[in-house]
């Protein structure tokens, strides 16, 4: 109990939003494992408002305007009721329910929002929105899981309405998204001078909505947030003025949104920004960024990640290394095998399609070997030798047979080979043209036949 009121007192006296928000954290700490239980037991439903007013203000010596005091009393009264539902899990109470926890915490969120709109809570307290919004999402997911599992037990052998079932599966999280959206609007629409504005909370609430929309598989709704931010950009501080943690998360999600729209260059720009700013010790965050940055780089620059880059991330090393090795060697069968082996994870992460484009690079590397194996033309008049730039299509066809592990009975169609060559030329992976009447590929001279590879 003491820790809740101590956090509130020190937060108010020092003007520390994070310390104040700690008072509303709905979990016990290692320093105070009985924090929630003792807070709930300190009063009852008949006296909670009076007890809170005394403990928050009179006993603590915290002086605030009457209206603001009323707002905090209402918020902590709602918090007390939510804690009552949470501690049932600590006590192994059979009536414990995450759905009830969510409903009670939803009241905390709505009361906190009213505190800003009706009771004049100051802008420096917006970290309270971060904490309450974060756990609103957490409790919503737990509640939906609980409801879904109970529904499966109750209706295991009965017919169900699939459309309704899909909707109800995330009903609590949908509700949480609507409330967090109100927090977003609360921050974005504040007209106070920027020094004392809730606008400083805009990227944290945006990031929370991104996470929620992605969990709901409603990525399209995230674009509405970006449009709203763009429309209000003139009234917002520069992005660099916000905390790094807010910026990195925001840039990551914006990058992924562009990635899913197949705008890989824009995606790479945002993801690279997030990668460069991300704390070196934030292992999980850096791994998430690389999950999308590697495929982006593959598409935009046709280059592969180094072993040094992936070494600290064993999961990504296991995921990408087989593909990278096959691309580098021009092993088309090995590439197809690696894509099939990682298909489930690639589809889950939504990176399958850009990785599939790596087959073109593998084919480019296979055909590049043909070009290199062709050697040099005879030098004339003491000039340095230049590589043979006229290569028979039949040589590329032979390489394709090797790259696809074709047996002696398999036939490689020349028209198919010409089509593959044309595709590589069109995509800028080769420079030259096909002289069909002579069955020849004429490649550029001067080390530009295969751009970016040095030959």
UniProtKB/Swiss-Prot annotation:
Q: Which InterPro entries match?
A: Csn12-like (IPR045114), PCI_dom (IPR000717), WH-like_DNA-bd_sf (IPR036388)
The chain positions of domain PCI read: 248-448
Q: What's the short name of a Pfam family annotated to this entry? A: PCI
Q: Does the keyword field hold Cytoplasm?
A: yes
- Gene transcribed to yield this protein: csn12
Q: What is this protein called?
A: Protein CSN12 homolog
Location of this chain's protein in the cell: Cytoplasm; Nucleus
The family note in this entry says: Belongs to the CSN12 family.
Keywords carried by this UniProt record: Cytoplasm, Nucleus, Signalosome
**Alphabetized PANTHER family for the sequence:** PCI DOMAIN-CONTAINING PROTEIN 2, UNCHARACTERIZED PROTEASOME COMPONENT REGION PCI-CONTAINING
């Amino acid at each position: 109990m003491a820790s809740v009121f101590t956090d509130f007192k020190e937060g108010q006296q020092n003007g520390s939003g994070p310390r104040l928000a700690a008072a509303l954290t709905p979990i016990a700490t290692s320093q105070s494992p009985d924090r929630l239980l003792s807070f709930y037991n300190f009063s009852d439903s008949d006296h909670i408002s009076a007890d809170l007013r005394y403990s928050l203000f009179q006993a603590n010596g915290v002086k605030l305007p009457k209206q603001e005091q009323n707002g905090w009393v209402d918020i902590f009264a709602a918090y007390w009721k939510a804690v009552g539902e949470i501690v049932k899990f600590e006590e192994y109470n059979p009536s414990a329910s995450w759905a009830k926890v969510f409903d009670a915490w939803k009241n905390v969120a709505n009361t906190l929002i009213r505190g800003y709109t009706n009771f004049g809570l100051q802008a420096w307290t917006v970290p309270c929105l971060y904490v309450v919004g974060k756990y609103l999402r957490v409790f919503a997911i737990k509640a939906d899981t609980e409801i879904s599992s109970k529904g499966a037990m109750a209706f295991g052998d009965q017919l169900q309405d699939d459309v309704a079932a899909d909707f109800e599966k995330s009903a609590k999280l949908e509700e949480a998204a609507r409330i967090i959206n109100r927090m977003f609007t609360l921050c974005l629409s504040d007209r106070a001078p920027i020094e004392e504005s809730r606008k400083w909370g805009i990227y944290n609430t945006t990031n929370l909505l991104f996470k929620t929309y992605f969990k709901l598989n409603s990525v399209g709704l995230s674009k509405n947030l970006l449009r709203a931010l763009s429309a209000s950009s003139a009234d917002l501080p520069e992005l660099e003025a916000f905390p790094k943690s807010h910026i990195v998360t925001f840039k990551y999600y914006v990058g992924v949104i562009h990635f899913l729209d197949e705008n890989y260059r824009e995606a790479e720009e945002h993801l690279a920004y997030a990668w460069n700013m991300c704390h070196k010790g934030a292992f999980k965050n850096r791994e998430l960024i690389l999950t999308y940055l590697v495929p982006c780089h593959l598409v935009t620059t046709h280059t592969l990640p180094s072993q040094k880059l992936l070494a600290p991330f064993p999961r990504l090393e296991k995921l990408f290394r087989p593909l990278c090795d096959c691309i580098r060697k021009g092993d088309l069968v090995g590439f197809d095998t690696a894509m099939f082996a990682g298909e489930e994870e690639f589809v889950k992460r939504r990176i399958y399609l850009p990785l599939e484009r790596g087959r073109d690079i593998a084919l480019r590397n296979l055909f590049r070997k043909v070009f290199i194996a062709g050697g040099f033309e005879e030098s004339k008049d003491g000039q340095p030798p230049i590589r043979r730039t006229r290569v028979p299509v039949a040589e590329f066809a032979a390489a394709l047979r090797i790259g696809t592990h074709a047996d002696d009975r398999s036939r490689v169609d020349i028209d198919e080979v010409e089509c593959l060559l044309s595709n590589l030329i069109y995509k800028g992976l080769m420079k030259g043209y096909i002289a069909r009447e002579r069955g020849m590929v004429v490649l550029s001279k001067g080390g530009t036949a295969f751009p970016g590879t040095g030959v």
